[in-house]
Design a protein with these regions (language model features):
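Extracytoplasmic
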Residues: 22, 29-31, 43, 64-68, ...
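N-terminal post-signal-peptidase region of extra-cytosolic proteins
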Residues: 23, 29-30, 47-61, 93-101, ...
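Soluble periplasmic/extracytoplasmic beta-strand elements of cell-envelope proteins
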Residues: 24-26, 33-35, 47, 70-72, ...
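Electropositive
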Residues: 43-79
Length: 180
């Protein structure tokens, strides 16, 4: 069941984006959840992992940026589940998933990539706060045991099955609101 807080956040997001696409994503960092919304209804809810460094916009901060974003690029549509991407290139290797809450030395980007571009000039777009130039993605992870807690280096991590499912439901241009 969606909590009242979620309904208020979703309503404010929909109001702010009423001139955009009907399908939207809201990331609620306080709940470590991602919501897929269409026609004012929550279609799907997924656990996520945002940055262990907290929230922030600055380049090299390793923090998850806040505000309104757009999916600028989608990478990996034909990749097999758990495929490792390095610099957005399919390595043709698959990750061994870690189901325990263990932080490894590897920060593999796996399965799918939805690369985000900030929409708010001076806040998450342009200069030293540009989410796109910071390579902020929604992506799969090898460290599935850490989903639900802050563990990333700025991106939004998801279970591999979930990110593949979400990838099929969104498009380039889908709006993404990231809130603390």
């Amino acid at each position: 069941m969606v909590k009242l807080k979620n309904i208020a956040l979703i309503s404010s997001f929909l109001f702010a984006l009423n001139s955009y696409s009907e399908t939207l994503i809201q990331v609620d960092i306080s709940e470590q959840r991602l919501y897929l919304i269409s026609n004012n209804k929550v279609l799907s809810s997924y656990p996520i992992s945002s940055s262990s460094y907290g929230e922030g916009q600055k380049e090299n901060s390793f923090k998850t940026p806040l505000g309104t974003h757009t999916i600028k690029e989608m990478i990996g549509s034909n990749a097999t589940k758990d495929t490792i991407f390095i610099s957005r290139i399919n390595t043709k290797r698959t990750a061994s998933l870690i189901k325990e809450p263990i932080d490894t030395e590897n920060d593999y980007v796996t399965s799918r990539i939805m690369w985000l571009e900030g929409d708010e000039e001076g806040y998450n777009k342009g200069g030293a706060v540009d989410s796109y130039r910071r390579y902020i993605y929604i992506h799969g992870t090898q460290e599935e045991g850490l989903i639900g807690v802050k563990a990333s280096h700025g991106c939004i991590r998801m279970f591999n099955n979930d990110v593949i499912e979400l990838y099929k439901k969104v498009n380039i241009g889908t709006k993404v609101l990231i809130k603390a």
